[in-house]
């Protein structure tokens, strides 16, 4: 039943050109991250952006109030970024946006090419909802265990609709998608098709119950 979700008809104008510049870009989104995941993923981004200069990074912590903590991590790593909760825009384009705000996740997913779903790396194994990015046709990467979404994960892994890797495999998984844009696009298409295949589970269950 967790497959039954709706995507809005319209998305927010995030004005990402004001942050990243207006050159062609590919966006890596770290969605709903928890402690220790931000450092792991930011470290990987710092390596990959040297190989792929068009790569941009959007970090959305699960709890917006952790924004200052994540900002400290990025500063310690010497990662130039713009912190969205502070408003305004950077004096010059940066390659990383710390989106410590609320109500914008779906719009950020819409702007992304690759989505890493948080609470599944760096010792976190409960997982977050993978349906939204999959339904929107994005290449979705998760950790090896999503205890809270095991049923959904099993279905999607069986269809190769998710990429499930450990911490030490995450960098190469992202690199592979960046090196092979066609594969990245195909991965998103499979994810979207798999979700659509299972949409309607709630209504079918209701219909079955009515017949009993």
Regions found by a protein language model. Name each.
Residues 1-212:
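Nucleotide-activated sugar donor-binding and catalytic core shared by glycosyltransferases
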């Amino acid at each position: 039943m967790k497959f039954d979700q709706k995507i809005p008809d319209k998305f927010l104008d995030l004005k990402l050109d004001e942050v990243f510049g207006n050159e062609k870009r590919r966006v890596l989104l770290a969605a709903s991250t928890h402690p220790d995941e931000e450092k792991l993923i930011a470290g990987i981004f710092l390596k990959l952006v040297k190989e792929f200069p068009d790569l941009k990074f959007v970090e959305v912590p699960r709890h917006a109030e952790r924004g200052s903590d994540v900002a400290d991590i990025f500063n310690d790593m010497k990662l130039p970024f713009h912190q969205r909760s502070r408003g305004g825009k950077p004096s010059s384009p940066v390659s990383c946006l710390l989106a410590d705000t609320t109500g914008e996740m779906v719009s950020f997913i819409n702007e992304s090419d690759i989505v890493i779903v948080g609470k599944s790396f760096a010792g976190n194994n409960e997982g977050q909802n993978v349906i939204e990015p999959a339904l929107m046709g994005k290449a979705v990467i998760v950790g090896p265990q999503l205890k809270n979404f095991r049923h959904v994960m099993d279905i999607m892994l069986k269809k190769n609709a998710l990429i499930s890797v450990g911490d030490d495999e995450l960098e190469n998984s992202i690199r592979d998608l960046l090196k092979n844009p066609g594969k990245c696009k195909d991965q998103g298409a499979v994810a979207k098709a798999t979700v659509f295949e299972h949409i309607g589970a709630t209504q079918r269950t209701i219909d079955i119950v009515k017949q009993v």
